[in-house]
Swiss-Prot record:
Belongs to the aldehyde dehydrogenase family. Optimum pH is 10. GO terms for cellular component: cytosol; protein-containing complex. GO terms for biological process: gamma-aminobutyric acid catabolic process; L-fucose catabolic process; rhamnose catabolic process. This is Lactaldehyde dehydrogenase. Changing N286T: 6-fold increase in catalytic efficiency with L-lactaldehyde as substrate. Shows expanded substrate specificity. The active site is at E251, C285. Homotetramer. Transmembrane segments: none annotated. It catalyses: (S)-lactaldehyde + NAD(+) + H2O = (S)-lactate + NADH + 2 H(+); glycolaldehyde + NAD(+) + H2O = glycolate + NADH + 2 H(+).
Amino acid sequence: MSVPVQHPMYIDGQFVTWRGDAWIDVVNPATEAVISRIPDGQAEDARKAIDAAERAQPEWEALPAIERASWLRKISAGIRERASEISALIVEEGGKIQQLAEVEVAFTADYIDYMAEWARRYEGEIIQSDRPGENILLFKRALGVTTGILPWNFPFFLIARKMAPALLTGNTIVIKPSEFTPNNAIAFAKIVDEIGLPRGVFNLVLGRGETVGQELAGNPKVAMVSMTGSVSAGEKIMATAAKNITKVCLELGGKAPAIVMDDADLELAVKAIVDSRVINSGQVCNCAERVYVQKGIYDQFVNRLGEAMQAVQFGNPAERNDIAMGPLINAAALERVEQKVARAVEEGARVAFGGKAVEGKGYYYPPTLLLDVRQEMSIMHEETFGPVLPVVAFDTLEDAISMANDSDYGLTSSIYTQNLNVAMKAIKGLKFGETYINRENFEAMQGFHAGWRKSGIGGADGKHGLHEYLQTQVVYLQS
């Protein structure tokens, strides 16, 4: 039996062999086989990476933005050259279907190129002064050392979402991938190394959140920590960062409502909602997690929704190309989804189909539809993060908006209607960072991905995401 490959970290421009004894197994969720091992890194490793980033930052910031952008384009070119290799890694370690892995890799390269285009576009200001002969200048300056703590559901793209705006604006960065999906990050570091990016500008530290992650949030040399993950993890990062008043950018959980009005295009609504729920086996924070259907079309919609959900094929993505879903990420995730559904049934919900984990190897949970659901049930409030759709009927738009807003989360929402007035009322009434009208829940790189309430602080993408990595310096110049 072959020994799984043991990965190094990438610190200060070189791959660093782990000298410790503790390793973390990386498991293929489709087969439960160990596919690699990574160092169980410690705070000391994170400190070394932060120190390297601090040393590199002044010289990196001194480069013209257009030169920093040229380095980003070299990275994106390297990604495209290795696209097949990287997508295979994502399939293997994350259980993602092949088509989605390929999209993630291509989108990552495009995203880096998009951010590089901002090199000539982000600007300061000249402000009118009240004093004769004075000029007030507002400069946009880099923060310094930034850190990025990644999730496992879109692990490769999240490297770019944090790294690209950070580097373009003159910051350096230390990245910690999830211990469940680190192999693609190693491939990213190899590209960075091969293109010769200046030492210390990009660093990769491996390990767990409670050790490496806490140091990345709590080290006083860090100017900002950007973290994507659960609310509980975000709370810990925020508390640790608060000790140094370190800026945080947090993208956390979601419980996205989808509202279907009685005038909706049902074929479109069913397809968009099913696509939003089964993508990545339901493990996407911004996709529909609860559905509100107007009573006049409830039976018709539920029948169509059930047919579409039952038609979803799932299996091992390394073996099948005709599937829409792979497994959940690990045994703990599978158990959580099982518990959420079991509790819903205890509270009175009815499982129309699905509802039980698949026996055998792999962490598979089938598409599941829950009916006879009431708003007060836990399944309508707690993030499921699996291919489960609970459906509730409503009378009026006001009722639907009220139930949609009855949530600790505020990331995304959606509504399906052919009435522009209804859509506009929903837009004004829904208290979410994003609202989708007659389409699936998936953001654009030039938009702004930001949640309200417990879904996060700050945001990513577009002009506003770029500015998360900048701070202002105002100069009063008297002549």
